[in-house]
Curated annotation (Swiss-Prot):
Subunit and partners: NDH is composed of at least 16 different subunits, 5 of which are encoded in the nucleus.
Keyword Membrane in record: yes
PANTHER family membership: NADH DEHYDROGENASE
Organism: Oryza sativa subsp. indica
Protein name: NAD(P)H-quinone oxidoreductase subunit 2 A, chloroplastic
Top-level taxon: Eukaryota
GO cellular component terms listed in the entry, alphabetical order: chloroplast thylakoid membrane
Keywords: Chloroplast, Membrane, NAD, NADP, Plastid, Plastoquinone, Quinone, Thylakoid, Translocase, Transmembrane, Transmembrane helix, Transport
Molecular function GO terms recorded: NADH dehydrogenase (ubiquinone) activity; quinone binding
Example GO biological process: ATP synthesis coupled electron transport
Role according to the record: NDH shuttles electrons from NAD(P)H:plastoquinone, via FMN and iron-sulfur (Fe-S) centers, to quinones in the photosynthetic chain and possibly in a chloroplast respiratory chain. The immediate electron acceptor for the enzyme in this species is believed to be plastoquinone. Couples the redox reaction to proton translocation, and thus conserves the redox energy in a proton gradient.
Length: 510
């Protein structure tokens, strides 16, 4: 009898929770319409996978790409609307959050065609791969709009768990298994550190979880200048440092880049940084409003270490993916300048603009690496020698993307760095900008070293990998080359026509 009553109570409670969730989704679902499109795409993928055979594989790519494109369209139609806080304060919609969501969707849209041929050649399970990519994208989008500590943590873990699964997707590869283990352990540790910092904020603010309410709670409890806030700031900064691969919290990055499947690395190298930057800008600027000098100092130290260590260690690498891992550590050091400058002096605008350029440069480079790896089976920098003699298009594409990453004019990377450093200089960050300029020159050295290898014509330097390289046709239906071409064009011409991009970035509301 008691069991029967308890069972009835459980059913009633479950029904109430379901009805409340349905009511929220029905009346406030329009505020997360782009996210709902991705959820619908995920459900459709699962249904088709259960009811179809291997011949329907092209439909999986079509559904994934279409849901991402429709989600981008829905996001663009919502641009310039008034900021809205929905779902009982858990989710915020404004231009600032939406521009980060757009960047994440753009990364995913470019990464899917980049992965098609790789998945077919390596015989990886396609449905699960696309499900993890879309779910990670969904987690990143919710992270960009999350307005309270619990939603931030859940969205972050949704993104992180999919990232761990993707990094270990080639289960028979020992390096992939090693990369997954390191990524999982370091990622779990960093999440624990981040949540510990959140718990300090929760306690000091009198039990508040919404970002703006935390500020009000700190004022009411008179704890905004207490030592506890400094402890919370340190733990949250360390947690964010792991997520952003900032030195000295970067140890996992080179191994994960080297061991994971290359399309996965391409996806994680940009989406993880965009999502973490969206979180860092809000979590530091809102709850730690009264400790701005302290977190500015912490970020300056981390940015300097990242720029110096990242670029110095990149010079010594023999693996292309490890070199790009250390290069990405240096690149995120430059982006931190924009966060430190903040909303004044166009700091956030310069950060958003550079991240857009970085997406095209980085994904273009990885597209070239995926293509070269599939045709030769090597990742060693030395084995790229003489590629121009066999495949001029691939060699030129890789050279343009690398030179753009280095910041050579008139490529997009030059204009992005110029604007970023100029904003930092105007804000008085003279030492930080000087370090950025010096390390940028250093990065050009190892990028030019690779470009020189690509263009060499001396037979004694050309390895068997390039000698036996099969030449690609002038006109190709290769989806990797499609992504590569789009990224190369963007890396080349976006900087010249960056005024409209700047205007949109400056129009974001924080």
């Amino acid at each position: 009898m008691i069991w029967h009553v308890q069972n009835e109570n459980f059913i009633l409670d479950s029904t109430r929770i379901f009805m409340k969730a349905f009511h929220l989704l029905l009346f406030q679902g329009s505020f997360i319409f782009p996210e709902c499109i991705l959820i619908f795409g995920l459900i459709l993928l699962l249904m088709i996978d259960l009811t179809s055979d291997q011949k329907d594989r092209p439909w999986f790519y079509f559904i994934s790409s279409t849901s991402l494109v429709i989600s981008i369209t829905a996001l663009l139609f919502r641009w310039r609307e008034e900021p809205i806080i929905s779902f009982s304060g858990n989710f915020q919609t404004n231009n600032f959050n939406e521009i980060f969501q757009f960047l994440i969707l753009l990364c995913s849209t470019l990464c899917i065609p980049l992965s098609v041929e790789y998945i077919e050649c390596t015989e990886m399970a396609i449905t699960e791969f696309l499900l993890f990519v879309l779910t990670a994208t969904l987690g990143g989008m919710f992270l960009c709009g999350a307005n309270d500590l619990i939603t931030i943590f859940v969205a972050l873990e949704c993104f992180s768990l999919c990232s761990y699964l993707l990094s270990g997707y080639t289960k028979r590869d020992l390096r992939s298994n090693e990369a997954t283990m390191k990524y999982l352990l370091m990622g779990g540790a960093s999440s624990s550190i981040l949540v510990y910092g959140f718990s300090w904020l929760y306690g000091l603010s009198g039990g508040e979880i919404e970002l703006q309410e935390i500020v009000n709670g700190l004022i009411n409890t008179q704890m905004y200048n207490s030592p506890g806030i400094s402890i919370a700031l340190i733990f949250i900064t360390v947690g964010l440092g792991f997520k952003l691969s900032l030195a000295p919290f970067h140890q996992w990055t080179p191994d994960v880049y080297e061991g994971s499947p290359t399309p996965v690395v391409a996806f994680l190298s940009v989406t993880s940084k965009v999502a973490a930057l969206a979180l860092a800008t809000r979590i530091l600027d809102i709850p730690f409003y009264f400790s701005s000098n302290e977190w500015h100092l912490l970020l300056e130290i981390l940015a300097i270490l990242s720029m110096i260590l990242g670029n110095l260690l990149a010079i010594t690498q023999t693996s292309m993916k490890r070199m790009l891992a250390y290069s990405s550590i240096g690149q995120i050091g430059y982006v931190i300048i924009g966060i430190i400058v903040g909303d004044s002096n166009d700091g956030y605008a310069s950060m958003i603009t550079y991240m857009l350029f970085y997406i095209s440069m980085n994904l273009g480079t990885f597209a070239c690496i995926v293509l070269f790896g599939l045709r030769t089976g090597t990742d060693n920098i030395r084995d790229y020698a003489g590629l121009y003699t066999k495949d001029p298009f691939l060699a030129l594409s890789l050279a343009l993307c690398l030179l753009s990453l280095g910041g050579l004019p008139p490529l997009a990377g030059f204009f992005g760095k110029l604007y970023l450093f100029w904003c930092g200089w105007q804000a008085g960050l003279y030492f930080l900008v000087s370090i950025g300029l010096l390390t940028s020159v250093l990065s050009i050295y190892y990028y030019l070293k690779i470009v020189k290898l690509l263009m060499t014509g001396r037979n004694q330097e050309i390895t068997p990998y390039v000698r036996n390289y099969r030449r690609s046709p002038l006109r190709s239906n290769n989806s990797i080359e499609l992504s590569m071409t789009v990224c190369v064009i963007a890396s080349t011409i976006l900087g010249i026509s960056m005024n409209p991009i700047l205007a949109i970035a400056q129009d974001t509301l924080f």
